[in-house]
Each structure stands twice: as C-alpha cells, then as structure tokens.
Amino acid sequence: MKRRYFILAAILIMIIGGIWFGKRNNFFNASANENAFRDTNHLILTKHARCRMDCRHITAAEIKDIIHNGNVNYSKSGKGNKGDDTYALEGYSNEHQHIRVVVAAENEGLMVITCIDLDHEWPCNCY
C-alpha cells in the first residue's frame, strides 16, 4: 500500500513539475503564427535598416537567410517601441559575418527594424 502511494506521489510531482516547466518556458503559449516572424514573402526594410545594411555591407539575401535559418536570441527580443513583438535573429552569412537581424511581424509583412554585425564595428551615420 505504501509503495502505491509513493508511486502516485512521484507521478503527481512529475506532472506538476512538467506543468511548471512548460509555463516557465512558454511551451503552452504557442500559436499558429508562432513563426510569422520568419515569413519573408513581403519583407519591409525600414529606412534605418537599409542604412545599417549599407554601412555594414549586408545584403537583402543575407537578411532573408538569417531570418529563415537564424537562432532567436530571446534576451534581445521582446516588446518594441510601438508595443509590438520584436525578434532578434542571429546567424552567420555566407561571407562569415555574424549578424543579428531585429524584425517585427506587421499586417503589411515582416518589418526589418535593424541589422547588426556582431563581430565588427562599422562606421555609420544612421539615426
């Protein structure tokens, strides 16, 4: 009898731990638009992003590649200035540039807010 209660208690602890871990890591907040920030069919480059791309020698093709294949840096992602969700995607270009691209999914398409070369500081006069 004691063994049965021990097994039930262990199972209950595992279930509660799983729920706690899942909520802590947002596993239960997944939606159908979870990867909307990776859809580059309608890419909108802000004036700031175009300027940064020019300064840092980053092409639109490299931006798309990072958006499709890059890793989300959750510590650099979050709410933008307008209250929208922003995603910081990081990866390496074909030219071995370590790039971070910050995007936000908008009604009109995917907006590229900025891009950063993480390994090299380029002179730039963008504002």
Task: For every predicted segment, state its role.
Residues 1-127:
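Ribonuclease/tRNase effector modules and their secretory precursors
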